[in-house]
Amino acid sequence: MSSQKKKISLFAFFLLTVITITLKTYFSYYVDFSLGVKGLVQNLILLMNPYSLVALVLSVFLFFKGKKAFWFMFIGGFLLTFLLYANVVYFRFFSDFLTFSTLNQVGNVESMGGAVSASFKWYDFVYFIDTLVYLFILIFKTKWLDTKAFSKKFVPVVMAASVALFFLNLAFAETDRPELLTRTFDHKYLVKYLGPYNFTVYDGVKTIENNQQKALASEDDLTKVLNYTKQRQTEPNPEYYGVAKKKNIIKIHLESFQTFLINKKVNGKEVTPFLNKLSSGKQQFTYFPNFFHQTGQGKTSDSEFTMDNSLYGLPQGSAFSLKGDNTYQSLPAILDQKQGYKSDVMHGDYKTFWNRDQVYKHFGIDKFYDATYYDMSDKNVVNLGLKDKIFFKDSANYQAKMKSPFYSHLITLTNHYPFTLDEKDATIEKSNTGDATVDGYIQTARYLDEALEEYINDLKKKGLYDNSVIMIYGDHYGISENHNNAMEKLLGEKITPAKFTDLNRTGFWIKIPGKSGGINNEYAGQVDVMPTILHLAGIDTKNYLMFGTDLFSKGHNQVVPFRNGDFITKDYKYVNGKIYSNKNNELITTQPADFEKNKKQVEKDLEMSDNVLNGDLFRFYKNPDFKKVNPSKYKYETGPKANSKK
């Protein structure tokens, strides 16, 4: 390019950077993010929302002059690109967007190795083509750049136009989704209407507000929550109340398990033959087919948190990571104080993952059997941790030495994304959808099913089965919306938003000594487990703050809230702002009579639970039935096999 030819001005470089970042954002909307965009208004909003913040941020560098102005513009553009791409990779794995809260979980990434790498796609270079071109120009073709300063008097005009565009965007968004910023729990809504960059700013503001909430919280805030939850309490079913008093309680966590696998055949073979038997109602287990996970960004940790506290996880981040130092009145601590239970958690991963080694102390959990208690040599490990069959076998040996009554929680790992399994461990062929995630899920789910059967048989041999309450549950979905096309091939039906909600059934099975099994079709969620167990143990719950209700109570609440503000009842589901019938998943145009009441209850539940966590409200509670847990009395020793990894 000769000196007579027109050079690239700083303003032209600014426009190029804004346009290319916006184009990449559009690309992510339609290729990587599942935002459920419908109609002219939503598509118009999608075209509009990336510009405002990108232009506002980059316009700051128009105040600079010389080559450094171009470099600052380049760095700013690269950081915005990196934010976009980080959200893309995160969304592929979690079907959610990055928040400031999730940055506290960055330590988990190293442990998740292969699962994260599986989230990279061949076409990801698209996100960085412009970055490489700009870098080439800045390093090798500086003569193409017009280093004259941009007229500073026009910079405020550019900034004002960016701000005006944001408010226009917000006006359109409020028209299509009223009270977007005040009553929306779903991050997908926020990104759809605001874009990923404005969402990051919004999340930063909410994070600051939540951090301030603890300092401003008072006993009055606790009283409001107690008054609300006490109105919701239900009477225990006299047929079940106290039937499991001082019985061992074993809780088995099935990683990433979804109940569409129950009675599902692939290539003529049952995927989960053992769980199929437990689900028949003919065994000693009662099966709840309409049991849903209620997790948020914390996924596995959220399921643990919700089931042991009858609280919901946070709208952003993991309660384990962000609120691990709070005061709690958890199920294991109550069982200890009321009936002398000793509690433990068993998991074939290391204790720092999800901040477990700290938060368990605040739950009053006595012992943590982490990876250092198991042989973690290469032959015993797959994907994220210890193979389930080895984990269950060793865990049963530990349990055989425990004094009754104990409360024991076993967390499996093999059926975890990206669902890889050693060939020697596979006993069923993969499905043939062409999607490695979905096809691998079939094999790892079968392996989990076999491991569970071996464990149950082991409990019988060791004399632990008959005297124990045994709970089994799926912690969260395994197959995200990103794999809907493959799921349609596997299930032979269209995966609509309503159908995807149905697929969030993760199942709950419970064996109660002295009770026969069956099938219970009540709609329920993980928040309902704690009050159920307390009533089975014969513990009066009137002074405990819980958002769930007893599964066996005749007054059990069948409105199941999800962390994003959607919900399902026994008759209909509310998904992405629309109501669908449970019978056929068809859209309901006439609003059900109890819809507004249920919607307000869900919003209130989530709001009140968030207040408990953000305000650390249990620190104010003088519960006559509970002595506050002293976390300093708990110490989790390193196990005898700490050096087994090779």
Swiss-Prot record:
Topological type in the membrane: Multi-pass membrane protein
A Pfam family of this chain: Sulfatase
One term of GO molecular function: transferase activity
InterPro entries to which the protein is assigned, alphabetical: Alkaline_phosphatase_core_sf (IPR017850), LtaS-like (IPR012160), OpgB/LTA_synthase_biosynth (IPR050448), Sulfatase_N (IPR000917)
Region (Disordered) residue spans: 623-646
Pathway assignment: Cell wall biogenesis; lipoteichoic acid biosynthesis
Binding, Mn(2+): 255, 300, 475-476
UniProt KW Manganese keyword: yes
GO biological process terms, semicolon-separated: cell wall organization; lipoteichoic acid biosynthetic process
Disulfide bonds: none
Main localisation: membrane
Keyword Manganese part of the UniProt annotation: yes
Cellular component terms per the entry's GO annotation: extracellular region; plasma membrane
Membrane topology (Extracellular): 29-43, 90-119, 175-646
Similarity section: Belongs to the LTA synthase family.
Name used for this protein in its record: Lipoteichoic acid synthase
Protein's organism: Staphylococcus aureus (strain bovine RF122 / ET3-1)
Taxonomy of the source species: Bacteria, Bacillati, Bacillota, Bacilli, Bacillales
